[in-house]
């Protein structure tokens, strides 16, 4: 498959993506099986009543999943989780409870589904893994089950959250060392961040995701998180194109070039949080001062999607540099595809206090000059 992609002319990349669209029939069958499993679990007696369960296939269900991927997350929202602190404090107990209930469902064999529940990796595991198979599914599916505080029960996904919400998240309600550990709570916001994008951009994300999987097969772990590459693709499009009909090869090349410049990356979005709240602003400035690469989660400012190990990026950057020489970045006449002009960093506004000082000085100077003129 790697040979197929790298040898395809730039003009044929769109056709290549079409051949790797999500397997819609498999998704539909998987959804039916998951719905049946969720219905059984909802009827059981958990330590706290299940509010609802949300299942998403592959890459968090964002419309960017590749054909042939058979992994999924099953997020369990429980009524007795009413805050981030609750999730952190009760996570281990809830994971054990979910494992117990899954084992009982498996023993009863009521939904025609077979699954193998794995042992917990550690007493503090944040997820429970199991494999599922069913007569309607052509392949086995690997699941991670995660209990979560239902954040979207308190937020409108279509509106910018009250910034006090983020101020509470970063000031005391998130224990030290737990930053970014609550990312599953933000799944809905994160999905919407990508779901609202143009169709062709989502297809470009699929292409980048496929490239990432090829690199992973060749290089193995550790590599930067796949979600970092997805966000990098969105960023490249936002700053380099912003049109719904663009040259796929140009977008692909731009993303790979950004990967090679990982030491310079400083990327964030202000879709859900911004610098207008003083406490949030101070925190964002601290986050953006950290060693690069920095790619802040659009929904959760406590989480640097780029990770903490630049060595992971160095390995991926080496592979990206090699790929830039392949035929997939050349036209039929042999000329090279040009990338979009995209900066490696997003500018950071002045701190709140400095901004106030600046305006006070400006205002004083204004009154001094014009007050003196009017009195004269």
UniProtKB/Swiss-Prot annotation:
Its main location: endoplasmic reticulum. It is found in: Endoplasmic reticulum membrane. GO terms for cellular component: endoplasmic reticulum membrane. SUPFAM superfamilies: Nucleotidyltransferase, PAP/OAS1 substrate-binding domain. Changing residue 299 to V: In strain: MPR. Changing residue 368 to L: In strain: MPR. Changing residue 105 to I: In strain: DHA. Changing residue 103 to Y: In strain: MBT/Pas, PWD/Phj. One of its GO terms (biological process) is response to virus. It comes from the Eukaryota. Changing residue 65 to A: In strain: BALB/c, BID, C57BL/6J, C3H/He, MBT/Pas, PWD/Phj. Belongs to the 2-5A synthase family. Interacts with OSBPL1A and ABCF3. This is Inactive 2'-5'-oligoadenylate synthase 1B.
């Amino acid at each position: 498959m790697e040979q197929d992609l790298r040898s395809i002319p730039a003009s044929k990349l769109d056709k290549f993506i079409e051949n790797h669209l999500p397997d819609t029939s498999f998704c539909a069958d998987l959804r039916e099986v998951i719905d049946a499993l969720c219905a059984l679990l909802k009827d059981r007696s958990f330590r706290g009543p299940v509010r609802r369960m949300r299942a998403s296939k592959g890459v968090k269900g964002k419309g960017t999943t590749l054909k042939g991927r058979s992994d999924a997350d099953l997020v369990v929202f429980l009524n007795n989780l009413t805050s981030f602190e609750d999730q952190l404090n009760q996570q281990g107990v809830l994971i054990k409870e979910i494992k117990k209930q899954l084992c009982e469902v498996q023993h009863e064999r009521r939904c025609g589904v077979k699954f193998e529940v794995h042992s917990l990796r550690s007493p503090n595991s944040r997820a429970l893994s199991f494999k599922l198979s069913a007569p309607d599914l052509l392949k086995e599916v690997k699941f991670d089950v995660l209990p979560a505080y239902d954040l979207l029960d308190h937020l409108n996904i279509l509106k910018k959250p009250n910034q006090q919400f983020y101020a509470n998240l970063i000031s005391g309600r998130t224990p030290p060392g737990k930053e970014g550990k609550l990312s599953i709570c933000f799944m809905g916001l994160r999905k919407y961040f990508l779901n609202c994008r143009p169709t062709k951009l989502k297809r470009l994300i699929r292409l980048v995701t496929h490239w990432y999987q090829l690199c992973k097969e060749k290089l193995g772990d550790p590599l930067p998180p796949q979600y970092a590459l997805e966000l990098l693709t969105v960023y490249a499009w936002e700053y380099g194109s912003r049109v719904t009909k663009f040259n796929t090869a140009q977008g692909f090349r731009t993303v790979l070039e950004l990967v090679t410049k990982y030491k310079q990356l400083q990327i964030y979005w202000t879709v859900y949080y911004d610098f207008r709240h003083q406490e949030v602003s101070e925190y964002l400035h601290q986050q953006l001062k950290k060693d690069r690469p920095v790619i802040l989660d659009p929904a959760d400012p406590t989480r640097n999607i780029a990770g903490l190990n630049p060595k992971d990026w160095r390995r991926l950057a080496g592979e990206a540099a090699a790929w830039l020489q392949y035929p997939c970045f050349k036209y039929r006449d042999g000329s090279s595809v040009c990338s979009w002009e995209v900066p490696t960093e997003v500018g950071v506004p002045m701190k709140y206090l400095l901004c106030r000082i600046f305006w006070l000085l400006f205002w004083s100077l204004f009154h001094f000059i014009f007050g003196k003129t009017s009195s004269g």
